[in-house]
Amino acid sequence: MQASQFSAQVLDWYDKYGRKTLPWQINKTPYKVWLSEVMLQQTQVTTVIPYFERFMARFPTVTDLANAPLDEVLHLWTGLGYYARARNLHKAAQQVATLHGGEFPQTFAEIAALPGVGRSTAGAILSLALGKHYPILDGNVKRVLARCYAVSGWPGKKEVENTLWTLSEQVTPARGVERFNQAMMDLGAMVCTRSKPKCTLCPLQNGCIAAAHESWSRYPGKKPKQTLPERTGYFLLLQHNQEIFLAQRPPSGLWGGLYCFPQFAREDELREWLAQRHVNADNLTQLNAFRHTFSHFHLDIVPMWLPVSSLDACMDEGSALWYNLAQPPSVGLAAPVERLLQQLRTGAPV
């Protein structure tokens, strides 16, 4: 399919069916588009909307975000996952405040230099917010292009990604780029979906190679399968009435900056930790274990609950706090921690 025909059909479809009233599309600014694009990485629109609205209510400008404590940013992000995005968001906002006087940069080089911003995100900000001619290549766009032009291979491989970037550059029109890029994302999200694509509703159906050969399931190529390693983590749930002991993780690494239960690889390490702090472990109780899966490994979590008689226990741990179940502080929590805290709120641990 010729590039001009491709873009014309996509734009015509967008005018009729595309999404035009998402929260970040109303009174568009580079800040709003950037925030939404970061949140939308590996996350569905319906999940992102309430988070975006809460962020905009609390941080209406990039300067507000830059001046906020990281704990508060992570707290508002809790449940959205991939917390490196939130940490990079905060760093980038501070960079905008420091280097650009709080005005969001408007050149590709400056935007791409922000933490957590790659080529596609920079292109999305420039095209969607400012109408500048930059292509994008998010997951939805990759899927549409790979199927239409039968691009084999996993897009995570550099040569496949380069082929898709070349196609994206070719089909992105000189005019109407903001509508076109939004249309491509909408097309992938609404019509050219991962499973059960609605090919009969697609404006590219007649020129799509995958549709012609009924081979959409082959494109894009899947990531080579690998068996995820398994690890075990013993979580220590120290409870004093309605207070639960949490410690802040280091700034980088797994759950960086979030508040979590003390974690150990083995139960004897957990008991040794308690003994060193003169905490009686007679009433230590194992709760139901469960699995939490990361992108690169499975973590089998074994919660170990222990009621304590004093808040003084373990408060020499630096960045630690007693989390009040009735009046939760504004701190970021890892998803398994939130799950266990909710379990403790409902009453006796099981």
Swiss-Prot record:
Reactions this protein catalyses: Hydrolyzes free adenine bases from 7,8-dihydro-8-oxoguanine:adenine mismatched double-stranded DNA, leaving an apurinic site
Gene Ontology BP terms: base-excision repair; mismatch repair
Family annotation (InterPro entries): A/G_AdeGlyc_MutY, DNA_glycosylase, Endonuclease-III-like_CS2, Endonuclease3_FeS-loop_motif, Endouclease-III_FeS-bd_BS, HhH-GPD_domain, HhH_base_excis_C, HhH_motif
Pfam family, one: HHH
Enzyme type, top EC level: hydrolase
SMART domains associated with the record: ENDO3c (SM00478), FES (SM00525)
SUPFAM superfamilies linked to this entry: DNA-glycosylase, Nudix
Chain positions recorded as [4Fe-4S] cluster binding sites: 192, 199, 202, 208
PROSITE patterns: ENDONUCLEASE_III_1, ENDONUCLEASE_III_2
Gene Ontology molecular-function annotations: 4 iron, 4 sulfur cluster binding; 8-oxo-7,8-dihydroguanine DNA N-glycosylase activity; adenine/guanine mispair binding; metal ion binding; oxidized purine DNA binding; purine-specific mismatch base pair DNA N-glycosylase activity
Keywords: 4Fe-4S, DNA damage, DNA repair, Glycosidase, Hydrolase, Iron, Iron-sulfur, Metal-binding
Cofactors demanded by this protein: [4Fe-4S] cluster
EC number: 3.2.2.31
Site entry (Transition state stabilizer), positions: 138
Catalytic residue list: 37
Assembly with partners or alone: Monomer.
Protein family: Belongs to the Nth/MutY family.
Primary role: Adenine glycosylase active on G-A mispairs. MutY also corrects error-prone DNA synthesis past GO lesions which are due to the oxidatively damaged form of guanine: 7,8-dihydro-8-oxoguanine (8-oxo-dGTP).
Name of the protein in question: Adenine DNA glycosylase
Lineage: Bacteria, Pseudomonadati, Pseudomonadota, Gammaproteobacteria, Enterobacterales
